[in-house]
Structure formats: structure tokens, C-alpha cells
């Protein structure tokens, strides 16, 4: 979702976003036992490595050139993989306002372009979808598309069985290996040097909850089940931590106390927080995450995009202790109009485990160019 579109959706986002403008561990454990899938090449346990995060780009034809520079920079680095957190194309409303400046989103041709950019990356690549990639086609006024048909096409194009995308692929496991969740090929898991990763298909724009409530409920149940399996696997494997990668900003503030929320709201807008946040489509997932975190003491990195503001922090509140979880770090990557990426170094000798480095291509920034 673009920054222009954030203004459009401000009325839809609840609470501070508005104020601010053990289940079965199959397939995780089977992969661990065999070492044949879901494990990046050369990933002996215990060493350090780095991976790349990018997302919410490219939206415009001008940004495509900037994205090419980002890809060139990532290709020049030693990375275990690259994760694109979704919204790999423009919002339909942006396209219809400026059709000469962006590709028409969610067409087969645009999907092919996006896939081509992923295949130009020399590292393994994984995608977790965003709302621009399928659910926001309902925003078209001049074109009719079915979001569920587009989701089906996205799944068919971007999720080869058992492998990542990219020039050098890695083995991955999918939630679809469980017959109970056979359609959710996009929920992936893998390991690098003993560290467990998992993607969860949660998108912006209210997670498709208003357009297709039944699809949303089914996918939410799948995501919660996948979340529980990720934590169970991380514990069973003695993983040094856990990395969760998704698209949507899950609105952590919706689970803050009013005292915390009021202080935060005043610090950025001089406004008070509402007495109680309205229900949001991400609440059930956040509640499940809180429950898992209450029984997990190792570092967790929660990666997302959606609101296009690079930031890190400790935003998940524990209602039992009335404190924020020190061992969960949020990382939101850059997004349109900024064309940059984030390198995460995994350092087993560090208490935090994750060392986060924003990476800029100077030619992509008017700030650098002005200097």
C-alpha cells in the first residue's frame, strides 16, 4: 500500500494507526530429521550469516530502475536468501490515477515481470504476498478482476514445490504438505544454520476481511496454525531463535494498555488514545502470537512491511506482566517511494542474535543526490 493510499485507508485502520494517520510439527520436524528439505545449502549449525529483506516496491516505472539498483546491491552481498515481504506492484488506485507511470497490477504480465525480477537475484528468494498482489484488485474502478482467482494464479506462479525462487534456490517446506491446509502453498518454512524461518500470509488493507470474509477466516486459521508450528519446531530443534516474515503491519498497538497508547499517541501527535481500540482483523493472530511468546524466551524477529516506514522496536505487549516482550524485535522494511533494503546479520554470539542494517543505494535517494 502506497503512502498516498495510506491516507485513503486511514479511516479503515483502527486505534493508533488511525490516531497516527502443541499442534503437530509436521512438516517442520520431518524436514529436520532428514535434512533434505527446508534447509539452506551449506547451513551447518552454529555459524553467522546474513539475509536480505525488501518489499513494498516497485510501484512505478521510475521505481523499477531504482529497484534494479537494489537488486544489484543485494547480488553483490553474501546473503543466505532474500525475502520480499509483498506488495511487489502498485496499488490499483495509484495505477488508475497515473496509468502511464506504472504497470497495471495483478495481470499475468505484471506477475511475469515480478517473477523475472526475483529470478534476477542470485540468492534464494521467498515471497510472502501483500494486498497489492491480489486482494486489492477490488479497488479497480475501470477493470474487473476476481481477487480469489488472482490469488490462485499467484500461488501457481510463485511457489514451486519444495524450492524457493531465485537463481540459486534453497529447499523449503510448505504448509500445503499438510492435507488440512493443502491450498496454503505460500506459507513456507526453512532453516539456515539451525535458525528457523517461517512466512505467514497476512496482508494489509484489512487482510481481505471485508471483501471475502470466508477466505479471510480460513487463511487466518491457517496462519495461526502455522505460527504455532513454527514455535513448536523452534523449541524442538533448539533453534537459536525464530524469524517470522509477513506483509501486514499487525497493529501491535491494539494490544497496548491505554496508558502506553496514550503516551505514544501524545508523543507523535499530541493526541490522546481512545479508551478502547475497535476490533481489527489482526487481533486474533496477535493474541496467538502473545500466547506463544509467553512460553518462549529466545529471540524472535518479526519482519513486516505494509506501512512503508523503516523502523525497529519492541512493540509486543505482554498482558500478564504489563511489559513489552524484550525478546521480540519488530523490523519494518522500507517501501514506496523509498527504494532501499535491509540486511540482517545473524550473530550467535550476540544476546539479541539479530543485527539490523538499513542499506541505501545513494543514487535512489534525493537526499544523497542533493548532497
Task: Please describe what each predicted stretch is.
Residues 1-14, 21-28:
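N-terminal secretory signal peptides
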Residues 36-108, 239:
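N-terminal active-site segment of His-dependent metallophosphoesterases
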Residues 99-222, 226, 316-345:
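Extended active-site neighborhood of metal-dependent phosphoesterases/phosphodiesterases
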Residues 60-62, 90-93, 129-138, 205-210, ...:
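Active-site environment of divalent metal-dependent phosphoester hydrolases
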Residues 50-54, 80-85, 90, 124-129, ...:
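Structural recognition of the beta-strand scaffold that forms the well-ordered cores
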Residues 75-81, 191, 196-198, 211-316:
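His/acidic metal-ligating clusters that form di-metal
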Residues 307-371:
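Binuclear metal-dependent phosphoesterase catalytic core
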Amino acid at each position: 500500500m502506497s503512502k498516498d493510499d495510506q491516507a485513503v485507508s486511514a479511516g479503515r485502520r483502527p486505534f493508533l494507526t488511525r490516531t497516527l494517520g502443541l499442534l503437530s510439527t509436521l512438516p517442520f520436524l520431518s524436514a529436520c530429521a532428514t535434512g533434505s528439505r527446508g534447509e539452506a545449502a551449506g547451513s551447518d549449525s552454529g555459524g553467522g550469516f546474513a539475509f536480505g529483506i525488501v518489499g513494498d516496491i516497485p510501484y512505478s516505472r521510475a521505481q523499477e530502475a531504482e529497484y534494479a539498483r537494489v537488486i544489484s546491491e543485494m547480488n553483490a552481498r553474501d546473503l543466505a536468501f532474500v525475502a520480499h515481504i509483498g506488495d511487489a506492484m502498485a496499488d490499483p488506485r495509484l495505477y488508475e490515477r497515473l496509468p502511464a507511470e506504472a504497470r497495471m497490477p495483478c495481470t499475468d504480465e505484471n506477475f511475469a515481470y515480478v517473477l523475472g525480477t526475483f529470478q534476477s537475484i542470485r540468492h534464494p528468494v521467498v515471497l510472502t504476498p501483500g494486498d497489492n498482489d491480489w486482494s486489492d484488485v477490488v479497488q479497480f474502478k475501470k477493470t474487473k478482476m476476481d481477487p480469489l482467482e488472482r490469488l490462485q494464479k499467484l500461488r501457481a506462479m510463485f511457489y514451486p514445490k519444495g524450492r524457493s525462487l531465485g537463481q540459486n534456490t534453497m529447499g523449503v517446506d510448505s504448509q500445503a504438505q499438510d492435507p488440512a491446509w493443502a491450498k496454503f502453498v505460500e506459507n513456507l518454512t526453512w532453516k539456515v544454520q539451525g535458525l528457523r524461518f517461517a512466512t505467514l500470509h497476512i496482508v494489509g488493507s484489512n487482510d481481505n476481511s471485508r471483501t471475502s470474509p470466508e477466505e479471510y477466516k480460513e487463511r487466518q486459521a491457517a496462519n495461526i496454525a502455522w505460527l504455532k508450528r513454527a514455535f513448536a519446531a523452534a523449541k524442538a530443534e533448539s533453534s537459536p531463535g525464530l524469524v517470522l516474515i509477513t506483509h501486514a503491519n499487525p497493529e501491535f498497538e491494539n494490544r497496548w494498555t491505554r496508558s502506553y497508547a496514550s503516551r505514544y499517541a501524545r508523543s507523535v501527535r499530541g493526541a490522546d488514545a481512545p479508551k478502547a481500540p475497535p476490533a481489527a482483523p489482526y487481533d486474533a493472530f496477535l493474541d496467538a502470537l502473545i500466547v506463544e511468546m509467553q512460553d518462549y524466551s529466545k529471540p524472535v524477529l518479526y519482519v513486516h512491511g505494509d506501512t512503508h516506514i523503516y523502523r525497529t522496536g519492541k512493540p509486543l505487549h505482554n498482558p500478564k506482566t504489563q511489559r513489552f516482550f524484550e525478546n521480540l524485535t519488530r523490523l519494518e522494511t522500507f517501501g514506496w517511494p523509498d527504494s532501499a533494503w535491509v540486511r540482517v546479520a545473524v550473530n550467535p554470539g550476540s544476546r539479541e542474535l539479530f543485527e539490523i542494517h538499513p542499506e541505501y543505494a545513494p543514487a535512489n535517494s534525493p537526499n544523497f543526490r542533493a548532497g
